Amino acid sequence: MKRTLILFTMLFFVFITACTNEKEKEKTNDEPSSSENQPIEKETVVSPLTGNAATGNIDSRPIAVTINNHPKARPQSGLNKADIVYEALAEGTITRFLAIYQSEKPKIIGPVRSAREYFVDLSKGYEAIYISHGWSPTAKEMLESEHLDYLNGLFYDGTLFWRDSTRKAPHNSYISFENVVKGAKENGYSMTKEVAPLPFLSDEEINGISGEEMLEAVVSYGSKPEWRIKYAFDQQLGRYKRYSGDELTVDRETEEPVLLDNIFIVQMDHRFLDDYGRRTIDLNSGGEGILLQKGMMKRVDWKNVNGRILPYENGEQVKFVPGHTWINIVPDLDQAFQNLAEKGE
């Protein structure tokens, strides 16, 4: 009897202990951990060529468009939506633009003009579909022999491309982004591509931008006013406005100004190819450059990194301010670039 009582008492304590442990376990499982209480921070997805928060697919394939910059082609359509614009001499003192679009898709782009070999090379750095209306002999050879993806208005005039009746040829060829997609589909070109991102500054790094204060600067491609480009830093907007002569560069459809965050002026060797004033430009050797960011000027070097023209200082890559970038390619930096403050303008 005594043994039975002892055994019963022991079993009772084992049962009570087990119940208590189970309740504590249930209580622990019911209570969320401190890490579960923390709000989950959603990582911001940024566009690879602007560094700004993405509003569309970041794997959208870039398109590169040669845009006319003759005075009769101004104002242009779609320049305000370009992530990057390269400006270079095409014939004589006339420049053209290579506009790279990835983060935004303008409804209308143009006037579209003929291809140049250096623009084709630059477009390859972004694995872009190349858009032009016409081509130089060397650009034609490159596009065809290298089997690059392109749409040329010579073959789509009146279909994918159209003529604006209010302007005269060759300053009146336009294409819509919708027709770019249509043409790409017809030719079996992919419209998606993993795009390697450019290097961008953080907010903290932007506050630490150093250099010489320069709120206005000029890049000249010729002696005439229409080839004199002025960049003016708007301190309220924190961005640059671009002028051709005294005329603000705006979008033809919306009249919105082209606003820029990085102005990169680079000196490259130019050589004439023919009697039309066509040139070849050395995109590969590197050289001197000037970088304008947030009202500051810095003398840098440039390098071609996988087909992209990027700034370097003391061998280290200089990052861009997030936003839109304009790259001026000039034959002689000292001759082309002017600090308006030094001139007293």
Predicted regions and their residues:
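Long, intrinsically disordered low-complexity tracts enriched in Pro/Ser with mixed acidic/basic residues
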Residues: 26-29
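C-terminal motif of bacterial Sec signal peptides marking the signal peptidase cleavage site
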Residues: 15-18
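Positively charged n-region of N-terminal signal peptides that target proteins for export
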Residues: 1-5
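Cross-family signature of deubiquitinases and ubiquitin-like deconjugating cysteine proteases
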Residues: 7-9
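Bacterial signal peptide processing site
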Residues: 20-23
